[in-house]
């Protein structure tokens, strides 16, 4: 019963409802009407109800057409009632007071401001998609921010507007009059004839023509920048201003001749716009600040906003005339290029065309020739610029800082304020800071720097402590890469204590020789073995840094054990001093080879021999508890010593002793303090030196000089 009551309560089917149903249904639903014939039966009541419900839903758009204009939906139909901007006569789109549409005024104002400084204006194409969207928006009356759009896009849209004017801007009916006026013999006659023809134009056409010719004249006067003189402008925009009514039926050659005539006419109008329309054309092309574009900025907004430095708020950069403030720029050009409204009072004061051209040139310089701070990044490699709170953006300031930083780095060797230059240590400066306990294998890369820097750095590192001349650095040897104990200078990168480090390491070069360097003898490095503890290694490094340049007797043991074993430094492993002695004792316990044999097997290029016997060395180094017996001094004869081996000192050995050219200057003061910091082997050497007589101390000193020579070479 409820179904039936709902059926009775609804509208009955009639002809109007059927027409609405058929119009709104799809093709598949057209076959439904056979069900309507059997609607009297009770079986089809449900189907009829569904059809009627569907009809109500589908007929909703038809109800929208019956709504009154005062309803809420009247706003959606409002754009359809507006007149489109394009393809309309100027008499329809212009106001009652002969005012141009607001979008056309805005476009002409922007072209007047930015056109003279834009290369290829009216010639370069724009995006087709953007052009269509802008035309649709202007046709529908949508508010568009034209200041943010590219100038070329506005020029293309304006040409479309001229092309869509019925009968064209110069009126096709006056085509013969324009051509006849142009054929006058003299220029004055042509100007007078063109004035008469222009007077026959409709009022809106004449108004737009004056504004357009003024803008084109300004652009042509700045052809050095925009590459568009009056001839080029006439070629690009002339066919949109004047054509024949039946130009579509003309042949190609006829159209070409027609376009050439129009081009000559438009070019003459551009060049003589002030003579034809009077000097007051500028006052007619004036808008107040309340009219178009709302205080139009003369700055190139699109260019500035796309620039990376547009939002720069650097306080110490003085603003220039071109980029200081857009509102300030408006004060100059606004009275001249103000825009396109004749409702205000006409100004009686007239100026020449040269003044307008100069105003455009100044406008162009303010827009285009901006300060270089807008396009160039800041270059401040100096440390002061990196640490300073504000980076200098002036080009001159950045150049000054860059030059000063370069000069400071170049003249750093000549200044005495910072004697610890980092340029001497390129390998260390390029790596991060390492802990002290790490073994740096590539410390010899620091010797690859120029000789002048190293010599300067170490000669002025400690003026009061320099005991000898600094040696010329020898080329880095690959066989001595693993030495880390006897370094000539430190590899620390800590800059907090530069003066202390200089005084430590400058002594290592004060004992070195610069006159003669003995041939290199390969030896096993004195690097600490890896099983040593970290504390022991740090202690040794600290002791050696304080005793840099002093003779460590372990080097002599290294030479002796190296020559006895005949090892080569082709491998990369190293032995400590104790391990070297143990290895020698294991092979030949208590019987090392003679001095001559060791020299013969290991260094065949050594022509001069040492100044002491193997027995004396063995007794001093391997027997610390027993005193070395005094060796009689024989000058010019053979020397012998009471050693277990009974070796004799040959004349070659005597010659090697006296031909040693290593010159060392040693401070004897403070020797007692240094004795306390020596290693075990140095303590043994001290006891042996005390046992020797004054006449035999010369031999030990010569052996010390040999170690100094090796230290200097490294």
Curated annotation (Swiss-Prot):
GO molecular function, one term: GTPase activator activity
Tissue: Highly expressed in testis.
Biased composition (Polar residues): 299-311
Keywords, in A-Z order: GTPase activation, Guanine-nucleotide releasing factor, Phosphoprotein
Pfam families linked: RhoGAP
Marked site: Arginine finger: 123
Keyword Phosphoprotein: yes
Annotated spans, Disordered: 290-357, 370-419, 451-508, 520-563, 623-650
GO biological process, alphabetically ordered: defense response to virus; regulation of Rho protein signal transduction; signal transduction
Protein name per its UniProtKB record: T-cell activation Rho GTPase-activating protein
Gene that this polypeptide is encoded by: Tagap
Job of this protein: May function as a GTPase-activating protein. May play a role in transmission ratio distortion (TRD) in mouse, in which heterozygous males for t-locus transmit their t-carrying chromosome to 95% or more of their offspring.
PROSITE patterns: RHOGAP (PS50238)
Bias (Basic and acidic residues): 492-501, 527-545
Ranges of biased composition (kind: Low complexity): 459-471
Residues recorded as bearing Phosphoserine in the entry: 398
Chain ranges of the Rho-GAP domain: 88-277
